[in-house]
Amino acid sequence: TGTIIREDYTVEANKHVITGVADDTNTAKVALVGVENKPGVAATVFKALAAKNVDVDMIVQSIRSVGEPKTDLIFTVAMDDVVLAREVLEELQKTVDIEAVNIDERMAKVSIIGAGMLGQPGVAAQMFDILSQEGINIEIISTSEISISCLVAEDRVKDAVRVIHNGLLLDQRG
């Protein structure tokens, strides 16, 4: 029982899965360091941001180690929302145990776009390898059915777009 959302397809039928590379330099990384690791904390954080119309993207929650009572919550916001996000989060620190609010405004998102990314094993690995070979560090990774996005240092985003284009788009057409 259930609903089929898409038909099955073969790798051969979708060989040219990547249709473009995009970048977004209007991005800041927000890191909430040492957040209480208990139910409801993430909801509290994101409800507070939503109440002020701060749009959030690329969310990552990482447990420091097994049994650790703290976690780090990292996400991105648009540059226009940085000041407001900082105000909201600093106010939230009064009621939620958050050790630090760190914001890095020197970030950018680079994405590969194409239909059926989830049906193509290895595409993300290829992207990560290409960035690695160029010495570009990935801060955050986000995936969806149609895209794979990486947060990188803003001063490396043009290099990232170039090497991904050359390594993935040109390779699949050749």
Question: Can you name each region flagged by the protein language model?
Answer:
Residues 1-174:
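C-terminal catalytic "cap/lid" subdomain
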